[in-house]
Design a protein with these regions (language model features):
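Glycine/proline-enriched, intrinsically flexible loops and inter-domain linkers
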Residues: 1-87, 92-114, 118-263, 267-537
Length: 537
C-alpha cells in the first residue's frame, strides 16, 4: 500500500531528512582529524532509500557526491544483497569505479533497519589525508601507484570492527592516526543519521521510506522535466583544448534536448591517458547532471528524481570514461571541465542562465615531509580561481566551482606544516574583460621553514588555455607556478629546501558580453579597488 502525503507533511519530512544530513556533516567537522574535512569541506553525507536512491545530501556539500555516493550504495547492494546486510554493519570502499572516482576518497555505507526491516542507507565519503602510494602524483601511470585499494568490504560486521582490515589500512598510509581518525568520524556520522532516521520513522509512524521517496522523486523529476522542456529542442555543441602534458587534450560535447530529456554526448574527447587525470564515468555523470541543475533548476534540493531526465554518453576508453586500471587520483583536473562544457553548449540557447568559464579546475598543492621529531606528515592545500561572469553579474573572486571546496585558512595551514605564508591576495587584471567582468584569481606566496626537504605535488590547470568568455567577453588570466622566481613545470614533483619560495597564481574567470558595453561606474569601481592591471579586467 502506497502512503500518500499532503504538501505540508511532505515539506516537513523532506526538510527533516535534509537536516539529518546537515547534522551529520557538523559531526564530521567537529570530530575529524584532518583539515581536509574540518576546514576544506571535502566530504559529503547522503541518505538513500532501501534501493540506494538519493533522498538528500548535506547542504553546502561537494556536488559530485550526490551522483557518486548513491551509486556506491547500489554497488554494495549488488555485492552483498539485502539478505547479506545486518544491523551494525558498516561497509567501506575507495574503489574509483564504484566510489567517487579516486582512491583518496573513502566511502562508508551503513544499512539502516527499522522494526527488523531494511529501510535506508546512511552514506558518507571523505578525502583522506593520505591513502599511501605516490603523493598525489599526477605523473602516476596506473591505479596501483596511487595507494591502497579497498574493494567493497565491511569495516564493521554486526557491530564488531574488522581489526585485520584496520591494521592493513594503518600499515599502508603515512598518517595512520589522522586517516583512521577521519574514518571513525565518518562512522559516527553514519550512526547519527541512522538514529535520526529511526526516530523520524517512529514519530510519523512510517513502516517504510519508499512511499515518501517516490513522492519526492516524482515531484522533483516532474520539475526537472518541465525545466528541460522549456528549452528549445536541438543539439548544441561546444568544445575546447586544455593544458595536457606533452600535448593538449580535446574536450567535446553534443548536448541534445528532445522534449523533456537531455542527453550529453562526449564523443570526440581525447582518449584516456597514462597520467593520473582520467575521470571515471560516475564522476562525469555527476558533474554533467550538476551543471544541468545549475542552469535549469538551481533552487531545488538534491535527490534522485532531479537526475532521471539527464542521460550521459561517454565512449569507453576516453578521458571521461577510462578503463581499469587507469590512474585517476587527480580526476578533478578533467572532471571539473565537464560543467564548463555543459554550460558552454547551453549558452547558445539560454545565454541568460549560464556563466562564462571559471578559473577551475580546482588547484591544490600536496606536500609531504618529515617533522623534526622524525614523524612523517602529509598536507593538502586547496586554492581557487575566479568565477565566470553572467549576463547580469560580475564573476565572484576566488571561489571554488564546481567543487565547492574551501581554502584552508592560513593560520591552520601554518600550524600543520612548516610553511610560512608571505601573502595571499587578489590578482589584479586576472578577470576576463566584458560587460560583466570575470572574477579574479589570487596570488599565494609561501616559504619553506623546514630544515628537512618538503616534496610538493601540484594540481593546476589553465596555465596554457584560459577560461573562456561568453557573448564577446574576454578570457580570464592564465595561472602560473613559480619557485624562487622561476616558472616551473607544475606537472612534476618538486623538492623544497629551507628558504625556498613558491608563488602560486590561480587563473581568473571569463567575462560576459563585450567590454565596451561595461558601465562607466563599474569601470571606475574596478580601478578604485585595484581590480584592473595587466591583462583582463
Amino acid at each position: 500500500m502506497t502512503t500518500r502525503f499532503d504538501a505540508i507533511t511532505l515539506e516537513v519530512l523532506w526538510t527533516r531528512i535534509i537536516s539529518v544530513t546537515d547534522e551529520a556533516a557538523k559531526a564530521i567537522v567537529r570530530t575529524s582529524f584532518s583539515t581536509l574535512s574540518n576546514e576544506a569541506n571535502d566530504f559529503a553525507c547522503v541518505l538513500t532509500d532501501a534501493r540506494g536512491y538519493a533522498l538528500a545530501q548535506n547542504s553546502g556539500s561537494i556536488p559530485s557526491f550526490i551522483g557518486t555516493l548513491p551509486a556506491t550504495v547500489r554497488h554494495f547492494l549488488r555485492e552483498f544483497g539485502e539478505d547479506g546486510l545486518k544491523p551494525g554493519d558498516v561497509l567501506i570502499t575507495n574503489d574509483p569505479w564504484q566510489g567517487t572516482g579516486h582512491m583518496s576518497d573513502v566511502s562508508l555505507v551503513k544499512p539502516i533497519f527499522h522494526r527488523e526491516r531494511l529501510v535506508a542507507f546512511s552514506a558518507t565519503t571523505s578525502h583522506m589525508p593520505d591513502i599511501g602510494g605516490r603523493v598525489r602524483a599526477i605523473e602516476a601511470r596506473e591505479l596501483f601507484e596511487e595507494g591502497i585499494h579497498i574493494p567493497l568490504s565491511r569495516i564493521i560486521r554486526d557491530g564488531q570492527r574488522d581489526e585485520t582490515l584496520i591494521r592493513l589500512i594503518r600499515a599502508n598510509v603515512r598518517t595512520p592516526d589522522q586517516t583512521m581518525g577521519d574514518i571513525w568520524a565518518q562512522v559516527s556520522a553514519n550512526e547519527l543519521m541512522e538514529n535520526r532516521v529511526r526516530r523520524l520513522m517512529e514519530e510519523y509512524h512510517l513502516y517504510s521510506l519508499e512511499g515518501l521517496a517516490d513522492e519526492l522523486f516524482g515531484r522533483s523529476e516532474r520539475a526537472m522535466r518541465e525545466a528541460i522542456a522549456a528549452v528549445p529542442d536541438g543539439t548544441y555543441r561546444y568544445g575546447f583544448q586544455t593544458d595536457g602534458f606533452e600535448k593538449s587534450y580535446t574536450f567535446k560535447i553534443a548536448l541534445t534536448i528532445k522534449g523533456d530529456e537531455i542527453v550529453a554526448d562526449f564523443t570526440g574527447t581525447s582518449p584516456a591517458q597514462p597520467r593520473a587525470i582520467n575521470c571515471v564515468y560516475a564522476y562525469t555523470y555527476a558533474m554533467t547532471a550538476y551543471a544541468v541543475r545549475c542552469a535549469l533548476l538551481p533552487g531545488l534540493p538534491n535527490n534522485e528524481g532531479m537526475y532521471r531526465p539527464v542521460k550521459v554518453e561517454a565512449p569507453e576508453g576516453c578521458l571521461l570514461n577510462p578503463r581499469f586500471p587507469a590512474a585517476v587520483v587527480s580526476r578533478a583536473q578533467t572532471g571539473h571541465y565537464v560543467p564548463v562544457l555543459v554550460l558552454g553548449a547551453l549558452h547558445k540557447v539560454i545565454p541568460d542562465k549560464v556563466m562564462a568559464g571559471a578559473g577551475s579546475p580546482l588547484w591544490a598543492v600536496a606536500q609531504t615531509g618529515t617533522r623534526d621529531d622524525g614523524r612523517p606528515y602529509t598536507n593538502v592545500l586547496f586554492f581557487n580561481g575566479g568565477m565566470g561572469a553572467t549576463s547580469g553579474k560580475d564573476g565572484e573572486h576566488v571561489l571554488s566551482w564546481p567543487s565547492n571546496i574551501s581554502s584552508t585558512p592560513v593560520e591552520v595551514a601554518e600550524r600543520n606544516s612548516p610553511l610560512f605564508f608571505h601573502y595571499k591576495r587578489l590578482r589584479a587584471g586576472s578577470g576576463g574583460a566584458g560587460r560583466h567582468r570575470g572574477g579574479l584569481g589570487q596570488d599565494i606566496l609561501v616559504e619553506s621553514g623546514s630544515t628537512r626537504p618538503i616534496v610538493l605535488s601540484f594540481m593546476a590547470e589553465r596555465t596554457k588555455f584560459p577560461a573562456p568568455g561568453f557573448k564577446g567577453g574576454g578570457a580570464g588570466g592564465l595561472g602560473d607556478v613559480r619557485i624562487n622566481g622561476r616558472k616551473v613545470d607544475h606537472r612534476r614533483q618538486h623538492v623544497l629546501a629551507r628558504g625556498d619560495r613558491v608563488l602560486v597564481s590561480t587563473p581568473g574567470g571569463g567575462g560576459y558580453g563585450p567590454a565596451r558595453a561595461r558601465a562607466a561606474a563599474l569601470r571606475l569601481r574596478d580601478r578604485l579597488l585595484g581590480y584592473i592591471g595587466g591583462k583582463g579586467g
